[in-house]
From Swiss-Prot:
Part of the 30S ribosomal subunit. Contacts protein S5. The interaction surface between S4 and S5 is involved in control of translational fidelity. The keyword Metal-binding does not apply. One of the primary rRNA binding proteins, it binds directly to 16S rRNA where it nucleates assembly of the body of the 30S subunit. This is Small ribosomal subunit protein uS4. Belongs to the universal ribosomal protein uS4 family. The keyword Transmembrane does not apply. It holds the Pfam family Ribosomal_S4. GO terms for biological process: ribosomal small subunit biogenesis; translation. Gene3D superfamilies: RNA-binding S4 domain. GO terms for cellular component: small ribosomal subunit. Residues 104-168 form the S4 RNA-binding domain. GO terms for molecular function: rRNA binding; structural constituent of ribosome. InterPro entries: Ribosomal_uS4 (IPR022801), Ribosomal_uS4_arc (IPR022802), Ribosomal_uS4_CS (IPR018079), Ribosomal_uS4_euk/arc (IPR005710), Ribosomal_uS4_N (IPR001912), S4_RNA-bd (IPR002942), S4_RNA-bd_sf (IPR036986).
């Protein structure tokens, strides 16, 4: 069974809570991506920060070790869809920000694919179980969708939205 792992917080809040520019930027991002609360935004910022930190730590390694480790990191980020090209330098990883992470959320991709009319409807469709990835129902709007899974997103089997879409396609 092994040792139980130590649970960690998945997010880190801002160091100073009342900076006007940051508050305005956060409100704008929450509206654009249909986030329910700032914690969801802070999770994305923390994830992006961790990737940037890993990339910075690779820069201090010897060249032969850095080459292999950076290739693994870049391929992983490419599969996640956070970078556009698998053959980029480690400097590209330093450009990852919270918006790139928010673009990969299931809620955002459902909206961008046109399965929902608004970003808020996209969240509701996901939470209510109307969206599936490769036939498996996913009810977490914050699920990070990989490049391979992005093509497999559709309405869930048995969803009334799927039936309506099929009827509209036949008509």
């Amino acid at each position: 069974m092994g040792d139980p792992r130590k649970p960690r917080k998945k997010w880190e809040g801002p160091k100073h809570p009342w900076i006007k520019e940051r508050l305005e930027r956060e409100r704008e991002l929450m509206g654009r991506y249909g986030l329910r609360n700032k914690k969801e935004l802070w999770k994305a910022e923390t994830l992006a920060r961790r990737f940037r930190h890993r990339a910075r730590s690779l820069l201090g390694l010897p060249p032969e070790v850095r080459r292999e480790a950076s290739r693994v990191l870049v391929e992983s980020l490419y599969r996640m869809g956070l970078i556009d090209n698998p053959n980029v330098d480690i400097d590209e990883v330093l450009g990852i920000n919270a918006e790139k992470v928010l673009e990969r959320r299931l809620q955002t991709i459902v909206y961008k694919k046109g399965l929902a009319k608004t970003i808020y409807q996209a969240r509701q469709l996901v939470v209510h179980g109307h969206i599936a990835i490769a036939g498996r129902r996913v009810t977490s709007p914050g699920y990070l969708v990989s490049r391979e899974e992005e093509k497999l997103i559709d309405y869930a089997p048995g969803s009334p939205f799927k039936e309506r879409a099929e009827e509209a396609a036949q008509a």
